[in-house]
């Protein structure tokens, strides 16, 4: 269990996105258990995210269930995606449901606007300490990845929340992508204290951002 999520008030709101979709802490925990039941333990999956409730739910749920997501930009260039796919050959890919038909894989499960697909690739062994993977350069598709450990998640969340004095009453606005280390750090540190994250895909130059 990462970030002591089971100790948060289960009816408290964990995330609200720009569409008004709400995710509670209890729902996040239940979703983690669902992913754990769907996937073989320690499965590698490519997780193509957007800044919305589904992106956070699948990211946290995958990690919390003991699986290992490589978190990527949902709009990564096709050639770069296939390059990563050929190198790492993930047994599962999770994408926004609007993109699922573009990949010719078997649909396993759909929730929070994302669809989990089975690629048919053979499972590979991943290190027991590995929690998730991130690209080294945002959405460029570099085959080099940053490896993160479970203990790093906890330590960073504790350090950041302590340094900034974060509390459950905070309402951070997340505009950084989830496939950026700093973007995920905002998520981890605020979930650690039971805060409510406001996440948006909109740019600060968009009129809708300020409405």
Region spans (language model):
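ATP-dependent adenylate-forming carboxylate-activation enzymes
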Residues: 49, 70-85, 195-211
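Conserved AMP-binding/adenylation subdomain of ANL enzymes
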Residues: 154-171, 181-211
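Conserved AMP-binding/adenylate-forming
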Residues: 34-76, 177
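Conserved AMP-binding/adenylate-forming core of the ANL superfamily
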Residues: 8-39, 79-82, 148-151
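Hydrophobic alpha-helical segments in the ANL/AMP-binding
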Residues: 3-4, 53-72, 82, 160-162, ...
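Conserved pre-ATP/AMP-binding loop-to-beta segment of ANL
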Residues: 7-11, 118-135, 142, 149, ...
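Conserved AMP-binding A3 loop
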Residues: 22-25, 130-158
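ANL superfamily adenylate-forming
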Residues: 21, 79, 92-130, 142
């Amino acid at each position: 269990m990462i970030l002591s999520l089971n100790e948060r008030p289960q009816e408290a709101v964990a995330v609200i996105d720009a569409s008004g979709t709400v995710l509670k802490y209890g729902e996040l925990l239940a979703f983690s258990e669902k992913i754990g039941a769907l996937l073989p333990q320690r499965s590698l999956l490519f997780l193509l995210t957007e800044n919305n409730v589904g992106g956070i739910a699948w990211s946290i749920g995958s990690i919390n269930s003991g699986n290992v997501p490589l978190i990527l930009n949902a709009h990564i260039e096709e050639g770069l995606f296939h390059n990563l796919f050929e190198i790492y050959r993930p047994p599962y890919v999770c994408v926004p449901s609007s993109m699922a038909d573009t990949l010719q894989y078997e649909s396993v499960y759909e929730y929070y606007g994302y669809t989990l697909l089975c690629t048919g690739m053979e499972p590979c062994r991943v290190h027991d300490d590995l929690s998730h993977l991130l690209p080294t350069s945002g959405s460029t598709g570099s085959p080099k990845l940053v490896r993160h450990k479970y203990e790093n998640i906890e330590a960073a969340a504790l350090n950041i929340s302590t340094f900034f004095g974060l509390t459950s009453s905070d309402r951070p606005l997340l505009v950084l992508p989830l496939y950026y280390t700093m973007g995920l750090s905002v998520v981890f540190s605020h979930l650690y204290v039971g805060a409510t994250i406001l996440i948006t895909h909109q740019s600060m130059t968009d009129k809708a951002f300020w409405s």
